[in-house]
Regions:
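Bacterial N-terminal signal peptides that target proteins for export
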Residues: 1-7
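Structural motif
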Residues: 51, 96, 126-127
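Short beta-strand edge/turn micro-motifs at domain boundaries
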Residues: 116-142
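Bacterial N-terminal signal peptides
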Residues: 7-16
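A mature extracytoplasmic/lumenal domain signature
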Residues: 51, 61, 92, 105-106, ...
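Surface-exposed, charged secondary-structure patches
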Residues: 70-112
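Short, low-complexity N-terminal intrinsically disordered segments enriched in polar/charged residues
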Residues: 2, 16-53, 69
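A short gly/proline-enriched turn/hairpin at secondary-structure junctions
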Residues: 55-66, 77-82
Length: 142
């Protein structure tokens, strides 16, 4: 008699623990939230912290940049030029082990303009279990 209630209790605890487990996409989504927060505060150093030390930034119409210092300088220049806000909508996130690929659409505010576009990011989870951007490429819809 005691066995059945104990089995049900264990099953309930196991299932409730599974319900609280984050999805595979949650790590990159949480890191992207940090990116958006820093971006919308025009915090170039905060944006750069979401990237791996050897990350690649591939802005449309510009040379490829490598490393967090170059990425920080790029975003500081963009903020100084009038970039002020970003909204991102994930279209698809595919996760395999410690790598993830995210395709998103975005709208960036530049001075008084709204610029829509799309991007692809490669995320990598480090030994510290933090997801960081390894590669970021984008272009506008116009």
């Amino acid at each position: 008699m005691l066995r059945r209630p104990l089995s049900l209790a264990l099953l309930t605890l196991t299932l409730s623990g599974c319900a609280n487990m984050p999805s595979a996409e949650q790590g990159p989504q949480d890191a992207m939230a940090q990116f958006r927060t820093a971006f919308n505060k025009q915090d170039a150093a905060g944006v750069a912290r979401v990237f791996k030390d050897d990350a690649k930034l591939l802005p449309a119409g510009k040379p490829m940049l490598t490393g967090t210092e170059a990425i920080r300088a790029y975003w500081q220049g963009a903020f100084n030029a009038g970039v002020s806000h970003i909204e991102k909508t994930p279209v698809e996130i595919a996760v395999s082990g410690d790598l993830a690929v995210e395709t998103s659409s975005y709208v960036v505010t530049f001075k008084d303009q709204q610029i829509a576009g799309k991007d692809t990011l490669v995320w990598q989870r480090g030994q510290d279990k933090q997801w960081r951007i390894a590669s970021d490429i984008w272009n506008s819809d116009k």
